[in-house]
Amino acid sequence: MDAGVWYRSLPRFTRYWLTATVVLSMLCRFDVIPLHWLHLDRSAVFSKLQLWRCMTSLFVFPISSNTAFHFLINCFFIVQYSSKLEKDQYSRSPADYLYLLIVSAVLANIGGMIFNVYFLMDTLVLAITYIWCQLNKDVTVSFWFGTRFKAMYLPWVLAAFEFIFHFSLASLVGIFVGHVYYFFKFQYSQDLGGTPLLETPQFLKRLVPDVSGGFGGFGLPPESRAPPRQATESPWGRGMTLGRN
């Protein structure tokens, strides 16, 4: 497939996310923008009101010869799991997916400030991966060396590899972020009968109207969204510890 055709075929917010990540990271890689201006820094945010760091830390990644593969794998996960969420569960409700990203970004910033995670790409990527895996628990995924297991275990496997080999909490923070969203959006209301707590604000619905027609999975209980599918590849590899400059 032609690269331009493939790029335009990506769902809207996945495409925006991938573009912002690649462009901002490459600008820092070639020293067009100093990296230390963009990473999450609690004291700079609160003492100097450098509020842009809360946004840029979600997209910028410190690319080097040691971390390039890590960066590419994260981009793959954006394309793989963000696309699936946006096209399947949120196909008719793009504003709901935008709100998911906003809530996840806010929680990622809070977790990053608490645990001193300076670059939040891993955190946000794993949060979205976790949500997809919870909504598709029985899908079989393939990991390294041909190992296969249900999707619900994938985030924990990734976080374990990250922590064991790089002593990073970024992925665990991502799981926490994803679980908070999943619990309050789906489990609390559908399984426990609680009042929905993460309803998309109306101004976002007006900004990004729902799509009429078609068949979207959003709004169905997680266990009834889709039957088990064939294995999907997940060639995850880690090359750095988030929080390091």
UniProtKB/Swiss-Prot annotation:
Belongs to the derlin family. Residues 1-17, 80-99, 178-245 are cytoplasmic. The chain crosses the membrane at residues 18-38, 59-79, 100-120, 157-177. The lineage of its organism: Eukaryota, Metazoa, Ecdysozoa, Arthropoda, Hexapoda. The keyword Endoplasmic reticulum applies. One of its GO terms (molecular function) is signal recognition particle binding. It is found in: Endoplasmic reticulum membrane. Pfam families: DER1. The keyword Transmembrane helix applies. Residues 39-58, 121-156 are lumenal. Coiled coil: none annotated. It is a multi-pass membrane protein. It comes from Drosophila melanogaster. Induction: By endoplasmic reticulum stress. Keywords: Endoplasmic reticulum, Membrane, Stress response, Transmembrane, Transmembrane helix. This is Derlin-1. PANTHER family: DER1-LIKE PROTEIN, DERLIN. One of its GO terms (cellular component) is endoplasmic reticulum membrane. Residues 218-245 are annotated as: Disordered. GO terms for biological process: endoplasmic reticulum unfolded protein response; ERAD pathway; positive regulation of apoptotic process; protein quality control for misfolded or incompletely synthesized proteins; response to endoplasmic reticulum stress. May be involved in the degradation process of specific misfolded endoplasmic reticulum (ER) luminal proteins. May also involved in endoplasmic reticulum stress-induced pre-emptive quality control, a mechanism that selectively attenuates the translocation of newly synthesized proteins into the endoplasmic reticulum and reroutes them to the cytosol for proteasomal degradation.
